[in-house]
Amino acid sequence: SVLTDAQKHRFEENLELDFSFGLKGLSRFRANLFNQKGAVGCVFRAIPYEIKTFDALGLPPVVADLCKKPRGLILVTGPTGSGKSTTLASMIDKINIDRHDHILTIEDPIEFLHNHKNCVVNQREVLADTHSFADAVRTALRQDPD
């Protein structure tokens, strides 16, 4: 099974579940498990192990400029499947290569996996590493992210 016991329990309680998992040598996947017509349904999206560069994604130069900013809020919005997670992963990777900082993500679920390059990258998953987004955001400043 790709589900942990805790995830199985959450699915039984909530009748739906967002989660991610990886198959070695193949890919990572984001999945949404749900009930429909008395049966279980699931939708999977592939998450590549390799994070694409700005050039490969066709992102405008202004996105690279945003990654140089020492502070601020950047909103990446769009419909499902439009590339929000891929864009954010590319931005995190760019920062990870170009800077020497502490990157902290709060995700539901963790999608792209980031290795430490020039930054320390801590990825927290809601309901696995923290009880809620609110709790994670509240304690984030104590974890000294840049």
Segments (PLM) and residue ranges:
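N-terminal "pre-motor" subdomain/linker immediately upstream of P-loop NTPase catalytic cores
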Residues: 1-79, 87
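Short, conserved catalytic or interaction motifs in soluble domains
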Residues: 56, 97, 145
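Conserved ATPase "switch" residues in P-loop NTPase domains
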Residues: 67, 96, 141
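Conserved glycine(s) of the Walker
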Residues: 83
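A conserved segment at the C-terminal end of the G1
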Residues: 86-96
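Post-Walker A helix-loop "phosphate-sensing" segment adjacent to the P-loop in P-loop NTPases
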Residues: 94-104
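Switch/coupling sub-region of P-loop NTPases
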Residues: 100-102, 109-146
